[in-house]
Amino acid sequence: MKTETKRPVDLYFDKYQESHNNETNEILHWICVPLIIFSLLGLVWSIPFPYIGFLGKYNGFVNWASFLIAFSVYYYYRLSPVLSYMMLLLIIVMSWGIVSLEQLEKSGGPALWLICVIIFVASWIGQFIGHKIEGKKPSFLDDVKFLLIGPIWLLHFICNKVGIKY
């Protein structure tokens, strides 16, 4: 009789779940994790990137965030292709939001980096409040990989809810 071994992604989810059982903490994660991703992406997007001539009018779409996106989607793909596609879709939507904030900045609004710093700090405060309520330290304090696991941990609940095998 053959026993089924768990995939690495499921082992990560099991470990992550250990410090995410309180309902309030979970709700805060559903709010704060996407905001942290958005703000981190926006902060990296804000770092000046050198002009590359052959990109022409598309220079604004290749920046340091492009490398972060490529790395994270590849990492997620190694864990679960389905979850990586879902993350890529979310990142595309977030990128649209970041480009919109860039346009706002160009028309006299607040700087993209400033908006992202505020969102980033507020979201991490929310995360730590959630873990204080939970009574357990955040998973990433044991292993930094869990900073990348949080977003797909949320997505795997959506997959389970609608019956998508990830």
Task: Show the residue positions of the predicted features.
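Hydrophobic alpha-helical transmembrane segments
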Residues: 35-42, 95-99, 115-119, 151-161
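Cytoplasmic-side transmembrane-helix entry/capping segments in multi-pass membrane proteins
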Residues: 84-93, 142-144
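Membrane interfacial helix-start motif at the N-side
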Residues: 13-34, 40, 71-83
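Membrane-proximal soluble regions of multi-pass membrane proteins
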Residues: 1-19, 132-166
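Transmembrane alpha-helical segments that form the membrane-embedded catalytic/substrate-channel core
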Residues: 69-81, 96-100, 119-135, 154-158
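Structural signature of hydrophobic alpha-helical transmembrane segments
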Residues: 51-66, 113-118
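Juxtamembrane "helix exit" motif at the C-terminal ends of alpha-helical transmembrane segments
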Residues: 37-56, 92-103
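Short hydrophobic alpha-helical membrane-embedded segments
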Residues: 30-33, 59-68, 86-91
